[in-house]
Amino acid sequence: MAIDENKQKALAAALGQIEKQFGKGSIMRLGEDRSMDVETISTGSLSLDIALGAGGLPMGRIVEIYGPESSGKTTLTLQVIAAAQREGKTCAFIDAEHALDPIYAKKLGVDIDNLLCSQPDTGEQALEICDALTRSGAVDVIIVDSVAALTPKAEIEGEIGDSHMGLAARMMSQAMRKLAGNLKQANTLLIFINQIRMKIGVMFGNPETTTGGNALKFYASVRLDIRRTGAIKDGEEVVGSETRVKVVKNKVAAPFKQAEFQILYGEGINIHGELVDLGVKHKLIEKAGAWYSYNGDKIGQGKANACNFLKENSLVKETKNFNGC
């Protein structure tokens, strides 16, 4: 519907006043927004990148990754850092849990010499560091490990047993309001790792909840629920874990999709295992019983042998080009 001439003049004057007061680009028509094409960073998992819809985690947004202990939360974020560094991006790791293992990070492909790392004393300090790094415009990816370890200053200075009801939630709520806009302006990806707690007295429904209040749930553009679903064994020795990630919230594509992959201890996400599974799904690799074949040639009996074949052959490059990746 056409707008009459007087309204168009009034609108143009208002837009001009807003841009004069708040700067160019402070208001625009949605179709003119250059940020409509979302830039992403790979998670290090092909199947998870596909499940996310946009091809990875969106830049300029807040992402929450949560799950039980030893489910692969930190491993997944380290894989994101490795992928970002390969693209020449600058990354920072806020280690509130004081538990980051540089040797393990290096095994996953992280360039530890160029990874910024901070071990803050309080939750407020951690979030202020996040804000300072974001406002610098020079850091592309920031990881906070974890929300549960962001302890308010008042709680640290108090005594054990003192009540500090809602302190962490208020701290996170204030931080989210401050960080969200700065992250968008700087095009910085901020990933929070979070832990799971159980609600007391829940008779029906899911008793699980995450720490830090509700603010992070609202401000996060993507929320990933990561779970360990089984063990990978080499004989009697456990060498890794079967992992399932559910996209429980997604503001940049369709939510509620799932990805399954293997995490191998000391190696990270088993990319070759994903290539085998996705190759079978897209009918690039044939599976008959325990045997896997490519173009009529057998490449291995069992998934482990097929993975070894991919590691040793250039077939990996060809398989990466299947439709959907």
Curated annotation (Swiss-Prot):
<dbReference type="GO" id="GO:0005829">
    <property type="term" value="C:cytosol"/>
</dbReference>
<dbReference type="GO" id="GO:0003697">
    <property type="term" value="F:single-stranded DNA binding"/>
</dbReference>
<dbReference type="InterPro" id="IPR049428">
    <property type="entry name" value="RecA-like_N"/>
</dbReference>
<dbReference type="InterPro" id="IPR049261">
    <property type="entry name" value="RecA-like_C"/>
</dbReference>
<feature type="binding site">
    <location>
        <begin position="67"/>
        <end position="74"/>
    </location>
    <ligand>
        <name>ATP</name>
    </ligand>
</feature>
<dbReference type="Pfam" id="PF21096">
    <property type="entry name" value="RecA_C"/>
</dbReference>
<comment type="function">
    <text>Can catalyze the hydrolysis of ATP in the presence of single-stranded DNA, the ATP-dependent uptake of single-stranded DNA by duplex DNA, and the ATP-dependent hybridization of homologous single-stranded DNAs. It interacts with LexA causing its activation and leading to its autocatalytic cleavage.</text>
</comment>
<dbReference type="InterPro" id="IPR023400">
    <property type="entry name" value="RecA_C_sf"/>
</dbReference>
<dbReference type="GO" id="GO:0003684">
    <property type="term" value="F:damaged DNA binding"/>
</dbReference>
<protein>
    <recommendedName>
        <fullName>Protein RecA</fullName>
    </recommendedName>
</protein>
<dbReference type="GO" id="GO:0006281">
    <property type="term" value="P:DNA repair"/>
</dbReference>
<dbReference type="InterPro" id="IPR027417">
    <property type="entry name" value="P-loop_NTPase"/>
</dbReference>
<dbReference type="GO" id="GO:0009432">
    <property type="term" value="P:SOS response"/>
</dbReference>
<keyword id="KW-0233">DNA recombination</keyword>
<keyword id="KW-0547">Nucleotide-binding</keyword>
<keyword id="KW-0238">DNA-binding</keyword>
<dbReference type="GO" id="GO:0140664">
    <property type="term" value="F:ATP-dependent DNA damage sensor activity"/>
</dbReference>
<dbReference type="GO" id="GO:0005524">
    <property type="term" value="F:ATP binding"/>
</dbReference>
<dbReference type="InterPro" id="IPR003593">
    <property type="entry name" value="AAA+_ATPase"/>
</dbReference>
<dbReference type="GO" id="GO:0006310">
    <property type="term" value="P:DNA recombination"/>
</dbReference>
<dbReference type="InterPro" id="IPR013765">
    <property type="entry name" value="DNA_recomb/repair_RecA"/>
</dbReference>
<keyword id="KW-0742">SOS response</keyword>
<dbReference type="GO" id="GO:0016887">
    <property type="term" value="F:ATP hydrolysis activity"/>
</dbReference>
<keyword id="KW-0227">DNA damage</keyword>
<comment type="similarity">
    <text>Belongs to the RecA family.</text>
</comment>
<keyword id="KW-0963">Cytoplasm</keyword>
<dbReference type="InterPro" id="IPR020587">
    <property type="entry name" value="RecA_monomer-monomer_interface"/>
</dbReference>
<dbReference type="InterPro" id="IPR020588">
    <property type="entry name" value="RecA_ATP-bd"/>
</dbReference>
<dbReference type="InterPro" id="IPR020584">
    <property type="entry name" value="DNA_recomb/repair_RecA_CS"/>
</dbReference>
<dbReference type="Pfam" id="PF00154">
    <property type="entry name" value="RecA"/>
</dbReference>
<keyword id="KW-0067">ATP-binding</keyword>
<keyword id="KW-0234">DNA repair</keyword>
